[in-house]
Design a protein with these regions (language model features):
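Anion-binding (especially nucleotide phosphate/pyrophosphate-binding) glycine-rich loop
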Residues: 2-148, 182-184
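Phosphate/pyrophosphate- and phosphate-bearing ligand-binding catalytic cores of soluble enzymes
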Residues: 4-5, 10-17, 151-328
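Catalytic cores of large soluble enzymes that bind and process phosphate-bearing ligands
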Residues: 24-28, 86-90, 205, 222, ...
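Residue-level signal for inorganic ion chemistry
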Residues: 29, 53, 117, 149, ...
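Short amphipathic alpha-helices in soluble, non-transmembrane regions
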Residues: 36-40, 209-213, 334-339
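Beta-rich strand-turn-strand
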Residues: 106, 328-334
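Well-ordered alpha/beta subsegment
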Residues: 341-343
Length: 343
């Protein structure tokens, strides 16, 4: 394992916020994790797991030991007549893993292309885009208990997946939005994911439920697009809407799309018939947060060096630069102001 003291965190968060970690450990294997948990200085200290840094806002220096997950590896672990089972190390860049599966002839993750972050973070957030969520393609994961050092595995039901939710976002005493996970099983701060396995179903079927993808299909003049075509379309759409963090610091889509009951949606539509909304499998209605923010006049506005992206209101951006970056406080002030106005 590689241990760094007073380590800069600006390179490790896509918003480009300046902060430091008192101790940062670059974890490149399961053995590295066990070494951390056996170290007399590191073992008793609080831990904080860091993947790609695309889903965090740093509001100050980090005192817990930062575990920078860099476990690599991509492989097909099983193939049946119904699915491919693919395993990826937690430190693999998510988009690279998606591209690898397609290159190997294992379609199914193409709608999730270009989502920032690492593989290990994907179950934590239950990432999703363009009609597909991680839980739709999830098989199982391996993790290590940070208190005991014991390894364990979880299947989809045990992960308690919900909308951008899982057991990894809840403390042990908190319930999750998932219907199959009992109270007392939250794993936030208690476990670190090392490997994730995906079940990619056969036969493959395209998911084209979103208008942007359907437009691309019509423009291409095809009835049944390939997985590679969908991958390319998703990448084009995301690049048109979302800024490159290397050029303009951001954390991707900052806000969750709110969900309401059908009755609430009917009331909202009566006030504004143009509101963008989508039915959900559980009977609720998802409202487009970006549309709501834009309708409230926030697109393009700023608070200090934190701003709302001109092309996509869901995205907050860093309008500072490396030597005079936005602060986490400015980002959170802007976010709270937007939430207050929308609600």
């Amino acid at each position: 394992m590689v241990v760094e003291k007073n380590a800069p965190l600006q390179p490790w968060n896509t918003f480009g916020i300046v902060a430091r970690a008192q101790t940062l450990v670059r974890v490149r294997s399961v053995a590295d994790l066990h070494a951390v948990l056996a170290d007399p200085e590191l073992a008793p200290a609080p831990k904080w797991v860091l993947g790609g840094g695309s889903n965090i806002i740093l509001t100050g220096d980090v005192k817990p030991v930062v575990l920078k997950m860099e476990i690599k590896g991509l492989r097909l672990v099983q193939e049946t007549d119904r699915a491919w089972i693919v395993e990826a190390g937690a430190g693999e860049v998510w988009h690279d893993a998606v591209a690898w599966t397609l290159a190997q002839g294992f379609p199914g993750l193409e709608n999730l292309a270009l989502i920032p972050g690492t593989v290990g973070a994907s179950p934590v957030q239950n990432i999703g885009a363009y009609g597909v969520e991680l839980q739709d393609r999830f098989a199982s994961l391996d993790a290590i208990d940070l208190a005991t050092g014991q390894s364990f595995s979880l299947d989809a039901a045990q992960c308690g997946f919900g909308y951008r939710d899982s057991v990894f976002k809840h403390a042990p005493s908190e319930p999750t939005d998932g219907s199959s996970m009992p109270r007392g099983m939250g794993l936030a701060g208690r476990a670190v994911i090392t490997h994730v396995r995906f079940r990619l179903p056969k036969p493959w079927k395209p998911v084209l439920g979103y208008l942007d993808l359907e437009r691309r299909r019509i423009e291409a003049g095809v009835d049944q697009p390939t997985a590679q075509q969908i991958f390319d379309w998703v990448c084009d759409i995301r690049r048109a809407k979302l800024p490159d963090p290397a050029v303009l610091g951001n954390a991707g889509s900052f806000f969750k799309n709110p969900t309401v009951t059908p009755e609430q949606c009917t009331d909202i539509i009566a006030r504004d018939p143009k509101i963008v909304h989508y039915p959900m499998p559980d009977g609720s209605i998802k409202l487009a947060a970006g549309w709501l923010i834009d309708a409230c006049g926030w697109k393009g506005k700023s608070v200090g060096k934190a701003g709302v992206y001109e092309k996509e209101a869901l995205v907050l951006v860093n309008r500072g630069h490396s030597q005079d970056s936005v602060t986490g406080g400015e980002v959170m002030t802007l976010a709270k102001a937007i939430q207050t106005r929308v609600y």
